Amino acid sequence: MASPARKWPSREGFTADVLTNWVQRLLLDPWKLVPILALAQYTVKGREIIESRPHLLKAIKTLTTLAVLQRLSAWLDRRSINNAVSDHYIWNKEVIVLTGGSGGIGRRIAQLLGDRDIKVAILDISPPDPSNPLPHTVRFHKCDITSPTAIADAAAQIRTTFGRPTILINNAGLLTGRTILGTTPQETRAMFEVNSLAHYWLAQEFLPDMVSNNHGMVVTVASQAGYAVTPNMVDYSATKAAAIAFHEGLAAELVTRYHAPRVRTVLVTQSFTRTTLIDRLTPEDSFMNPLLWPETVAEALVKQVLKGESGHVMVPGSSGYVAERLRGYPLWFQHSIRCQLERLMRAGN
């Protein structure tokens, strides 16, 4: 399905994320609120306005406090997950390994990175569509990422043609959209091998060079389904929960076990996206949980990668906020949400 041109306010239209961004910019920007508060308290005109509207000063103080605390929390988050150390990326010298880059979100990621003349090695079982060629810095390597031997062979080719990879993007994924009883052992096993276990095999191949140089990045493309288990895709949810655990554990091991604090880790948790993975399903497309275009997810991921920093890319933030915190809610609420999710993923057995 062809993506629409990027439009205002977003490809997905007017969504909760768009509204939230507007509120952030208009009402929770400390660079705007602090001067307004100063004018209200320390200028003659400001005091005159406040005296006639006493509740206005209280509102400004409340918003300013919230805005400052929010920025402080974000700064602490950023400092913590980057281990309080900086790093520098020279993009024409970096080498990116991208799994599942022949189609869907991965194809868009390869395009965006290639457009910047960044070297990208795609690992996939099928080549990209030749009718829409990728930039010259993007190369395809046929590889079964569930096989450590195949990964090692592809890695040798990449090191010969591109050099040693510095960034690994674990993007490949499988989804059958079937119930627990309706899925075959082969389907479930394949899903875990691609969505979860391959992350370990790929890290074991490419991470040692990053650790030895104390430079690099591992991007884990998971899913909001990893937070909110959904009927008709329980196995998929389990694989993505495992991918999230891989990301979190790797981030801690890089500091405590490998002493490589500059190796970055990025987690991507997206909602339903218009790719072939959901062809059999009936995902929601609403204000709170819009059906995403692959370009939207790819752009958010690439933006974070180009920062050269660890981070969490959550798209959309509205549904992700609820999903990420679901297990902290009362059991009755958790169960009702999971049961409601069934109608979004109704696709046969």
Which residue ranges define each predicted feature?
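Substrate-binding pocket helix/loop in short-chain dehydrogenase/reductase
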Residues: 179-180, 184-189
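SDR active-site lid
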Residues: 255-317
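Conserved NAD(P)H cofactor-binding loop of Rossmann-fold oxidoreductase domains
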Residues: 171-178
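Canonical Rossmann dinucleotide-binding motif of NAD(H)/NADP(H)-dependent dehydrogenases/reductases
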Residues: 78-120
